[in-house]
Design a protein with these regions (language model features):
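A structural feature that tracks compact, well-ordered secondary-structure segments
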Residues: 18-24, 30-36, 47, 82-90, ...
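Beta-rich carbohydrate-recognition and catalytic domains
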Residues: 108
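Short acidic DE-rich linear segments
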Residues: 122-123
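Short N-terminal "domain-start" leader segments
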Residues: 1-18, 33, 39-82, 117
C-alpha cells in the first residue's frame, strides 16, 4: 500500500485534525474518515497509524474489502463510541465483523491480531 500519511491527515478550520482513508489510486472515494477531531497533529498521526496497520493487511489489488462504521451508544459513564470493521469477500458478501473500542491503542493491537488471523484463513 502506497498511502502517504500527509495525504490523509488534514487540518480543519476549527484548529484540529482529521484523517480520511482512500482506496489505492482513487482519491475521490473515501473508505472511512475519523469523525473525532484530534487536538494535535501527533494525536491524529497515532490514530492514523493504528488504523492503517489494520487496513494494510486487507488489500486486494485495487480495492479494499473493508468498510468502517461508527457506533455511539449512551452508557452509564457517558457516550461510548466504537468502530465496526466489516469485511467482504470478492463477491461483496460480508464474511466477518469486528467491533473495536474508540482508538484505544492496546485494543487496536488486539483487534489487528485477531482480524489478520481471520482474514488469512479466508484466503
Amino acid at each position: 500500500m502506497t498511502m502517504k500519511k500527509s495525504e490523509c491527515i488534514q487540518r480543519i478550520p476549527e484548529g484540529g485534525y482529521v484523517f480520511r482513508i482512500y482506496p489505492p489510486n482513487n482519491k475521490s472515494q473515501s473508505l472511512g474518515q475519523s469523525t473525532k477531531v484530534y487536538a494535535s497533529e501527533k494525536e491524529c498521526h497515532d490514530a492514523f497509524d493504528c488504523f492503517i496497520d489494520l487496513l494494510a493487511e486487507h488489500r486486494t489489488t485495487d480495492e479494499s474489502f473493508v468498510k468502517i462504521k461508527k457506533h455511539s451508544t449512551q452508557g452509564e459513564n457517558g457516550i461510548l463510541t466504537q468502530w465496526t470493521f466489516h469485511f467482504y469477500d470478492e463477491n461483496g458478501c460480508e464474511v466477518f465483523t469486528r467491533r473495536m473500542p474508540y482508538w484505544a491503542k492496546a485494543n487496536c493491537s488486539k483487534g489487528i491480531a485477531s482480524v489478520v488471523r481471520y482474514v488469512k484463513e479466508l484466503k
